[in-house]
Amino acid sequence: MSFLHIRKRHRQPLKIITVLFLILTVAGIWYVNHLYRSVFENNVRIPGYEIYLNQSISLQDLADSLEKDQALLDVGAFRRTLKLMKAGDAAVPAGHYKLKEEMSNREMINMFRSGTQAPVQVIVRKARLPEDLAEDIASQMSFSADTFLHLLGDTAFLDSLGLDRHTIMGIFLQDTYEMYWTLSPRDFILRMKKEYDRYWNEERREAAAKKDLTPMEVITLASIVEEETAKEDEKPVVAGLYLNRLRRGWRLQADPTVRFARGDFSSKRVYLRDLEAESEYNTYKIDGLPPGPICIPSKSSIEAVLHAAEHPYMYMCAKPDFSGYHNFARTAAQHERNRQAWIRALRK
């Protein structure tokens, strides 16, 4: 009996050791799995969440921002991964970052630490003045409007591009462009010049030459067409009219150029006193085209000039039905009748 009792007592520590081993094994597996999930599993609550950093910050500070906006499923897991990767004090460069769907903490940290930005879509819209363009572009980029505007007037920089203060607006083409948010103003303009040169391929240059126009002169005429009509089907007709006047050596007498010279775009009405304004943009006073575009025209207006309609019209006047379309005329007498009809409609 005593022998059996001794053997039973010896089994007790073995059971304890076995149980402890199992507990430690399970705990170890759980811990390793927990670490693995912290590092490698998806932790994005808001796919497409965007971060704009004007200056470099630490990953710890960025974690605070992500927590505040509830962008992550488990911010604690993100912080633990920072410790494991010894990246808490790492700097995140200024830039635009975007969280992708199914992104792990490790992927996010590597993205931030390496400064791998997500490009932004920048829209170049119609603008009349450099100030308007600068405000619009700066609202989509990291640089300031003042910095951009200063460069638009930098004579030495413009000279290096073969441009001047009149023609610089002509290289901006209405479109959407993909680029990095932190691009400098200088590189932005160089990108626009590259896009301009790409647009003016051999076919378009030949089409311009057939009309005795340079690419910039096409842009300038297109800007007048852009301001004259919003009707796409009417643009080639308007372009053809102004080309007719140029070929005959007539002054363009385009009201939009008078409004541009006046600097007041609040009203489309042009008064007799406006026609006498001394300005290199007033086509009632100057021969030929103004020295540069009066706005950033759409590509459809540019194409309307390159593929202008052939017709005998020399005059145009807004239709009295206020449809936005115009009546076209070959003679001054016909034009005067159209003009009187428009005046009567205004007085009603």
Regions inferred by a protein language model and the residue ranges of each:
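Intrinsic structural disorder
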Residues: M1-I17, Q55, E67-K68, Y97, ...
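Signal peptide-directed extracytoplasmic domains
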Residues: Y31-W200
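Bacterial extracytoplasmic/cell-wall-associated proteins, especially those involved in peptidoglycan
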Residues: S58, I123, E135, M141-D146, ...
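N-terminal type II signal-anchor transmembrane helix
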Residues: F3-P47
